[in-house]
Amino acid sequence: MNPYQNNDEIVDVPENYDNNLNRYPYANDPNVAMQNTNYKDWMNGYEEINPSSITAILASIGILNRVIALTGVLGNTQEVISIIQDALGFIRNGTGNELLIHVEQLIQQTLATQYRSAATGAIYGISRSYDNYLMFFRQWERNRTRENGQQVESAFTTINTLCINALAPQASLSRRGFETLLLPNYAMAANFHLLLLRDAVLYRNQWLSNSISTANVNLNILRAAINEYITHCTRWYQDGLNRFDRSSRANMNEWRRFNAYRRDMTLSVLDFATVFPTYDPVLFPAATNVELTRVVYTDPIVMAGGRTAIPGFTRMENLVNSASRVSFLNQMNIYTSFYFRPHNIPRYYWSGNQNFLSNGTSNLYGYRSDGRTTFNVSNIDIFRVNMTTHIGGAFTDDYRGLHRAEFIGANTQNNQRTSLLYSVEIPSSHFRFENHTVFLPGESGLEPNERNYTHRLFQMMNEVSVNPNARGRVFLHAWTHRSLRRTNGLRSDQILQIPAVKTISNGGDRAVVLNYGENIMKLDNLTTGLSYKLTAVDSEASNTRFIVRVRYASMNNNKLNLVLNGAQIASLNVEHTVQRGGSLTDLQYGNFKYATFAGNFKMGSQSILGIFKEIPNIDFVLDKIELIPSNFMSSLEQTQNYNTYNQDTIYTHNQGYDTYDQNSSGMYHQSYNNYDQNMDTTYQPSYDNYNQNASGTYDDGYNPNASDSYDQSYTNNYSQNTNSMYDQGYYNNNYDQHSGCTCNQGYDNNYLK
């Protein structure tokens, strides 16, 4: 491509290059299963990391994606069991040791020999015992005899004891002084333990054939465990971050190691912790749409050195995107320039790129030039980038850069493999070429494809170093998880969980706060609010009534108003969650509470939902908004239990959990209970006047017809049979329920009491 002959090369509908992948000049065939070579490409020269440790990351990624799929079938017992068994298949005898070795290399610490065998064997032992438990559970499901129930209880007791012995404070997976080192193993074991405890809440009273329900005890053990495990994961993740030198003295190698720790611990620890709360079957009684908002970065491709400076820690960290509202890559402009020498031959290179995002913003990296190639990618999830770089020049020149890049992705409209190619001419006689492949592993193997990819390209950044007759560059790729969707699709058979940072609202009084990988929204001013576009995926969803629940943290009591298409439909008094002397800058799991608006509401086929904070000068953080089909839960007073129970650890818990003080009668403004909003496509003009400070409220790039058509694989392709999941024992007067609700909970028809 000559950039001066075609200044605006637009690629609107990319050609399918599925049969031409080998056109790219690989040193090795890219269609052959990638092992050590591609891992080194993925880590891009980070030699301190043992290539074999990729198997540990693959295990974590594989299990995580099964976990996200699992949240999409909560309520369907057989689907849940099948997914758990699939996840267990990722754990081999050496998985625990591989995870341990990997973190040892990242944080430069070694576990004492006498503790290693206990730690590395714990995960394998738990997985094998869990598999045995599932066998007995399925047998009991098919034939619910007392004898089969006793076998389930025996298997349950065995694995529960294994988990507690491994996860308890100072046990094999939380050894004092080595907590960070053991964290991926800890998170994996915690995940399986919580799934086990979830089964106890739903079924233990039945397989034991108890006449007196123990559901409350089992529920509170589960909730205490969720709190314990999330707190442990976030605390020791932060401890690991604090070990790195992040000063201006730190160099590129230190940043590489820091970034590898942040990325790999996100994939193997923090992502699990984000999903753990959905294992509470009272708060999440059915399929739930879970989306991860965090951004991770593959290792940089460094084309600097020689006569150009290699960026240090600070310059590299400046490339990393600060916390922001959710957005997606819609378009990328790539700019082409030419080197001063050698003369009379093509010598073009990638001089810069500009990323255009779905929220209307754009970011420029490097330099603009007249030569421009434009890729429209709003309907493409790029999951892999193949790059050819060069080093060389004439005489004493030291030019280092990029002249070829192939972006491979999935067309989200038809799920077909798609390739976009940037290529400019540069002579091999004067330059040495190197090939690089950048990606994050797929769901069931190292190499991602259009079916199993787990991450999509969010942004591509580059840092430039310039000297006379010398150029150096560093390329960095940012990725978001596939579970994050462009739209908020309402379904009649699923709880819609919307991360607060998916808001279409903007402004300085709406700050995004990074909270252990995931992003949350901080609201400051008097009428500050957040708005969200909702789209019903079908006519049934447009006629479904939804309960609205929020997860929040606040320094003081406040009042929230719920607004639908410009009309206020409910209000809610919320309690402070942070104790005196605390702050919203380092929020822990226990600092968040759930609160539910009274009533249920029909959203229509398309709508804009707003949450507005009423009381001024009170810092307030919103984490998630959840829309729950009203048929799943006729009452949500259990949410108040969740907020106020005694959160002792599961190892010293008080068996008197059965009594709660649920004096929640003063929590709700009881107006608007029967609001019916059936507005398909029209929004009331008065909506714009509700928040006087709102400007640029709507995202012009919104596509009302998108409706999540591109990625239903995580949550939507399962039978949602929720009729036989719940034990009425949750609600059999074991709580002090002063909420005034005496309604039939609707879960009491199919279980032994």
UniProtKB/Swiss-Prot annotation:
Which superkingdom is the protein from?
Bacteria
GO MF annotations for this entry? signaling receptor binding; toxin activity
- The membrane spanning regions, by residue number, are none
CDD domains with a match to the protein in the record: delta_endotoxin_C
Return the Polar residues bias intervals.
680-696
Q: Where is this region: Disordered?
A: 680-721
Would the keyword Membrane turn up in this protein's UniProt record? no
Other remarks on record?
Answer: Toxic segment of the protein is located in the N-terminus.
Belongs to which family?
Belongs to the delta endotoxin family.
Q: Which PANTHER family match?
A: ENDOTOXIN_N DOMAIN-CONTAINING PROTEIN-RELATED (PTHR37003), PESTICIDAL CRYSTAL PROTEIN N-TERMINAL DOMAIN-CONTAINING PROTEIN (PTHR37003:SF2)
What name goes with this protein? Pesticidal crystal protein Cry20Aa
Q: Please name the source species.
A: Bacillus thuringiensis subsp. fukuokaensis
What does UniProt list as this organism's lineage?
Bacteria, Bacillati, Bacillota, Bacilli, Bacillales
